[in-house]
Amino acid sequence: MMEPVYYTVDSIDGDYAYMTSDSGVENQVAMFLLPEGTTVGSRLVRENFEWNLL
């Protein structure tokens, strides 16, 4: 079981969201993997290989 990791979406460029975790790690994720309704400023959690909006 993976620990949850919390992210804030910083920008969206085409098919990719650029986000930063609460610990400062930057990440790039394909939009099709993220929940519908994800926008700039969204708070997300990744847990057990799933993304969820907070």
Where are the regions that the model predicts?
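Short, Lys/Arg- and Gly-enriched loop/turn segments at beta-strand edges
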Residues: F49-L54
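Short, structured beta-strand/loop micro-motifs enriched in basic residues and often containing a Trp
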Residues: S21-V29
